[in-house]
Amino acid sequence: MVCVPYLLLLLLPSLLRVSADTTEPCELDDDDFRCVCNFTDPKPDWSSAVQCMVAVEVEISAGGRSLEQFLKGADTNPKQYADTIKALRVRRLKLGAAQVPAQLLVAVLRALGYSRLKELTLEDLEVTGPTPPTPLEAAGPALTTLSLRNVSWTTGGAWLGELQQWLKPGLRVLNIAQAHSLAFPCAGLSTFEALTTLDLSDNPSLGDSGLMAALCPNKFPALQYLALRNAGMETPSGVCAALAAARVQPQSLDLSHNSLRVTAPGATRCVWPSALRSLNLSFAGLEQVPKGLPPKLSVLDLSCNKLSREPRRDELPEVNDLTLDGNPFLDPGALQHQNDPMISGVVPACARSALTMGVSGALALLQGARGFA
């Protein structure tokens, strides 16, 4: 974490310790486009990261170690390096595998505030200690995309609101996977005015009730795409209720890779968001078309389920783009392939997708513009 290009400028005196007899932990490609650092050595040469200052994409893993030793540089004012930071090419930054004091993370964000960074990924991090007091105005980067995977925070569910205060407005894509807490105190959360894509996939313990707690009412007014793959969703009606409570109007909803149950006959009917046009229910274990789906759906993916018959036209009156591949009524061997992807030498589409989901833990979601200034 500490070796991001910006913080290097803050901590340069303590980092210039070059060892000629050790393998470089950082590698920069021939085009000076991508730089990857993996500090797994017991005594890492942090200064190797200096070469990453010319790259557009930077990925840094701290080898699972604590970065508390660098706290002494966290109070350095990055303004003195503003011109140098602005000149850096980096647009995408990934930081991972470290125990990071919250004070140090904030110092990095303050330095990044002078950069042209657009996409930030935090992965396998343990953020420790209290977060510094909220600034009078956001001093961090103007991100378009923020992705977090397996990041824990001492502050519990308050982490998103605290992190949000250090980011400039304008975030359009937010991905949160393997979160330790998604029960956000809504009073401490500011409105995500520009957020169009929210991906809460790969949070299998979330469930319908957890979604209700995560989607704070009126905080996502511009939301267009909501992804809930492998998020422990239980029924379409439960998801519908959470969307209604949050007063969001997504145009596209992904509920694939959840074991969905059919809504109970006596359940209260839910009114889906009127803007919803596309719904992904693939890999949901469905044996029949769920009742009470959004009435204005035009795109529906029911592939790789357990449907024994083709849906009737009156069940899906407005759908003109329907995907049914991998269901038993089309392929008698579909169930066997879903249960055992390696049953034959040729891996069918449904099995390939399931294997990909298992290996990656998530399908990368990058909706919205990738225009870098």
From Swiss-Prot:
Residues 288-373 are annotated as: Required for response to bacterial lipopolysaccharide (LPS). Gene3D superfamilies: Ribonuclease Inhibitor (3.80.10.10). It is a lipid-anchor; GPI-anchor. Induction: Up-regulated in peripheral blood monocytes exposed to bacterial lipopolysaccharide (LPS). GO terms for biological process: cellular response to diacyl bacterial lipopeptide; cellular response to lipopolysaccharide; cellular response to triacyl bacterial lipopeptide; inflammatory response; innate immune response; positive regulation of cytokine production; positive regulation of lipopolysaccharide-mediated signaling pathway; positive regulation of toll-like receptor 4 signaling pathway. It is found in: Cell membrane; Secreted; Membrane raft; Golgi apparatus. Belongs to the lipopolysaccharide (LPS) receptor, a multi-protein complex containing at least CD14, LY96 and TLR4. Interacts with LPS-bound LPB. Interacts with LPAR1. Interacts with the TLR2:TLR6 or TLR2:TLR1 heterodimers; upon interaction with ligands such as diacylated lipopeptides and triacylated lipopeptides, respectively. Interacts with MYO18A. Interacts with FSTL1. This is Monocyte differentiation antigen CD14. It comes from Bos taurus.
